[in-house]
Amino acid sequence: MEWKLLLIVLPWLLVCKIFYKVEDFTEPDVAYQSIDYHPEDYIDSFTDFQKHDYFQY
């Protein structure tokens, strides 16, 4: 029974390993380089804490 499960799961793991890289899902690619992420457009609505975090005083 366990070997059947392995035969089903292993090929998918190999496919995922080959076609998908960890870099594809990291924060810089997903958030900071996305079309909708432009903090400077919303800088007037930032709280003091967010400004501190954004400008790294």
Curated annotation (Swiss-Prot):
Give the species this sequence originates from.
Answer: Drosophila melanogaster (Fruit fly)
Could you tell me the superkingdom of the organism this chain comes from?
Eukaryota
Q: What is this protein called?
A: Protein new-glue 4
Q: Which GO terms describe its cellular component?
A: extracellular region
Where is the protein situated, by its record's location annotation? Secreted
Q: What is its main location?
A: secreted
UniProt keywords, alphabetically: Secreted, Signal
Signal sequence extent: 1-16
